[in-house]
């Protein structure tokens, strides 16, 4: 009899990454280590239906994420949403990733608190937990109250210990993260005003931004 294959634990962290910065990367690393993930995939959104249009081209955002995770164990890049010629709905991505995994493999969708509170506005949001667990990155300063639809969902699907989430999908749990006061909006504003963003983004990302003259104010 062949030995049973070990269950894989895969995470997905989506975002516009416009640009990717140390806040994204620190959260990704902390979740990966805390949850014992085999891999956490940073997944740049092409045309996110719930966000403003990214300021720079998809290929530049993808390249910056690749530069950011180069050589970082267990962090990787997934470009599938950039290959779609239509709005990038999370449910489509989860269905696609789930189809590539084994039936028992665990898939974790990592969301920030604000994104989680906005779930009822997402396309086919009620189906998300059919394909994954949801890990919510909780901040001490989070002040948004979840809508009633999510209160009901949390009552039914919440797991107090994220490391105890069992099965391939179906539960929600919270992971505390180290709050870093950095945002992509702040970085874009600094760059547009000609100021340095060193130490807010990895050196390789800064080098890419400078080489391609991204986020500069129009002349």
Curated annotation (Swiss-Prot):
Record protein name field: Probable nicotinate-nucleotide adenylyltransferase
A molecular-function term among this protein's GO annotations: ATP binding
Top class in the EC scheme: transferase
Keywords noted in UniProt: ATP-binding, NAD, Nucleotide-binding, Nucleotidyltransferase, Pyridine nucleotide biosynthesis, Transferase
PANTHER family on file: NICOTINATE-NUCLEOTIDE ADENYLYLTRANSFERASE-RELATED, PHOSPHOPANTETHEINE ADENYLYLTRANSFERASE
Homology family: Belongs to the NadD family.
EC number: 2.7.7.18
UniProt gene name: nadD
Organism of provenance: Pseudomonas putida (strain W619)
Biological or metabolic pathway of the protein: Cofactor biosynthesis; NAD(+) biosynthesis; deamido-NAD(+) from nicotinate D-ribonucleotide: step 1/1
Biological role: Catalyzes the reversible adenylation of nicotinate mononucleotide (NaMN) to nicotinic acid adenine dinucleotide (NaAD).
Reaction equations catalysed: nicotinate beta-D-ribonucleotide + ATP + H(+) = deamido-NAD(+) + diphosphate
Lineage start: Bacteria, Pseudomonadati, Pseudomonadota, Gammaproteobacteria, Pseudomonadales
One Pfam family this sequence matches: CTP_transf_like
Biological process annotations from GO: NAD biosynthetic process
């Amino acid at each position: 009899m062949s030995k049973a294959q070990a269950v894989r634990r895969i995470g997905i962290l989506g975002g516009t990454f416009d640009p990717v910065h140390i806040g994204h990367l620190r959260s990704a690393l902390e979740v990966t280590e805390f949850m014992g993930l085999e891999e956490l995939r940073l997944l740049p959104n092409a045309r996110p239906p719930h966000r403003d249009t990214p300021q720079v081209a998809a290929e530049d955002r993808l390249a910056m994420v690749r530069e950011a995770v180069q050589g970082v164990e267990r962090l990787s890049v997934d470009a599938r949403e950039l290959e779609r010629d239509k709005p990038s709905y999370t449910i489509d991505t989860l269905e696609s990733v789930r189809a590539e995994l084994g039936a028992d493999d665990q898939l974790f969708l990592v969301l920030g608190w604000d994104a989680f509170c906005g779930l009822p506005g997402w396309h086919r949001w009620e189906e998300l937990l059919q394909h994954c667990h949801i890990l919510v990155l909780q901040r001490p300063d989070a002040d948004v109250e979840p809508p009633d639809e999510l209160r009901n969902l949390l009552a039914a699907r919440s797991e107090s210990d994220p490391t105890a989430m069992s099965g391939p999908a179906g539960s929600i749990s919270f992971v505390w993260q180290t709050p870093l006061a950095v945002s992509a909006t702040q970085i874009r504003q600094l760059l547009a005003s000609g100021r340095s963003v060193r130490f807010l983004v990895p050196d390789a990302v800064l080098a890419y931004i400078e080489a391609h003259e991204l986020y500069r104010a129009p002349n």
